[in-house]
Amino acid sequence: VAKYVKDGRLQKLLSFQTLYIGISPYNGPSIYTIIPMIESIYGVWFIKGGMFTMAKAMASLFEELGGKINYNCAVEEVLIQNGKSGGLSVDQQKIKSDYVVCNADFPYAMKNLIKESTYKGKYTDKKIDSMKYSCSVVLMYLGLKKKIDGLKVHNIIFADDFDRNISDIFQGNDPKDPSIYIYASTKADSSLAPQNKEALYVLVPVPDLSARKKRWTDEEISEYKKVIFSKMKKIDGLKDIENLVEYEKIYTLNDFESRFNAYNGATFGLAPTLGQSNYFRPHNKFMPIENLYFCGSSVHPGAGVPIVLTSAKLAAAELRRDVGSL
């Protein structure tokens, strides 16, 4: 970007989007500069009710088509027999199936759900540990007791020293002066909060576990919340942010790792480096095991909600192709 745009503010505006997929704008493949172009020229879709509406709609369609969803079940293993996936071990019970589609984070699945090293292919435990991972985030969901006129739908507060900010993230240091993205969903959809109140999604890129080398302590989370709030006070109406919050939920790499099985707490999965993109990214059809398919942010084509949905479409297409060949 700097080759064509000399103003440092515009450079940040046109390059920070690589953080949407957890990679440094200084090291990411230049193809990702297409993101701000798409946003500016075509815009982005908004789903009334938020992304949970998408999840509910997909679940509803799945059930309409005859599918059954089992909630609150721990998947322990992909069962393999004679080189074919034969079902799952769930809560210590074996459930047989002809095909398995796995949307668990690929590195986690390789290390925990595929038990026999024979069937891991090139993705051995050593290989998984040596791969490059995206950054993590500190994610805050905040409910405010009143409307804030100074907020837009999308709000970005850049670090004063953006270069240092990015360097800290990918060298394992919690940024002391972070860049912050604030999504005020209620500015686009008032149904997402009670009347005259505001719902905020606050995202702060930070190191993943492979870079940070340690999990967050409660004390560190509490202190970093102060750093984030201090930064948010730059927005008109948020000078007393501490007194406005009546609901708060904070996620760190600890939660992404424990709750969502994101390997290394890397929010966006495997980093989309040149050597981990396109053909070189884990495929949607897992060749070492017949009838096993993957979707999600760590497999082709990559991270981000629209891209992960595309990943699911590709996995479904591979499955349909194989079913049709029977």
Predicted regions and their residues:
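A conserved FAD-binding loop/helix module that cradles the flavin
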Residues: S297-L319
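Beta-rich nucleic-acid/ligand-interaction surfaces
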Residues: K68-V90, E246-A262
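Hydrophobic, well-ordered secondary-structure elements that form the walls
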Residues: V101, L142, V202, M232, ...
